[in-house]
Amino acid sequence: MDMMVPAQLLGLLLLWFPGSRCDIQMTQSPSSVSASVGDRVTITCRASQGISSWLAWYQQKPGKAPKLLIYAASSLQSGVPSRFSGSGSGTDFTLTISSLQPEDFATYYCQQANSFP
C-alpha cells in the first residue's frame, strides 16, 4: 500500500548578503513551497547584479547548522545526493530537487559568495 507523506512547507527566506565589492541583494522565490515526497521542486534565486557563478545553495534543518549543497552555481558538494542540482549564471539561478525525499523537508538558502571550499 502506498503511503503519502503529508505536504509540508519548504521554508524559503528572502535573504540579503554583502557582496565582495558592493552590497548585492539575493531574492528567492517562491517564498514557500507546498510539496509531497516524490515531487520535483524548483527554487529560484535572483541577484541584484551579475555575480557570474559565485552562488551557493544551503539546506538548514531546525537546530542544525546550514549544510552546503551546491557551490559555484552547479557543483555538487561531496556527499550530497544527486537528486540535488543547481544551474544558472549572472543574475538568475535555480536549485532543483528531482524527487523530494522525507529528509529534504527543510529551509533552503542561496548565498552569493566570492570563494568556495
Swiss-Prot record:
Record region (Framework-1): 23-45
Disulfide bridge map: 45-110
Cellular component GO terms, alphabetical: blood microparticle; extracellular exosome; extracellular region; immunoglobulin complex; plasma membrane
Signal recorded as keyword: yes
Cited InterPro entries: Ig-like_dom, Ig-like_dom_sf, Ig-like_fold, Ig_sub, Ig_V-set, IgV_Light_Chain
Keyword entries, A-Z: Adaptive immunity, Cell membrane, Disulfide bond, Immunity, Immunoglobulin, Immunoglobulin domain, Membrane, Secreted, Signal
An example molecular function term from Gene Ontology annotations: antigen binding
Domain of life: Eukaryota
Role noted for this protein: V region of the variable domain of immunoglobulin light chains that participates in the antigen recognition. Immunoglobulins, also known as antibodies, are membrane-bound or secreted glycoproteins produced by B lymphocytes. In the recognition phase of humoral immunity, the membrane-bound immunoglobulins serve as receptors which, upon binding of a specific antigen, trigger the clonal expansion and differentiation of B lymphocytes into immunoglobulins-secreting plasma cells.
Protein name, entry field: Immunoglobulin kappa variable 1D-12
Species whose genome carries this gene: Homo sapiens (Human)
Gene that this polypeptide is encoded by: IGKV1D-12
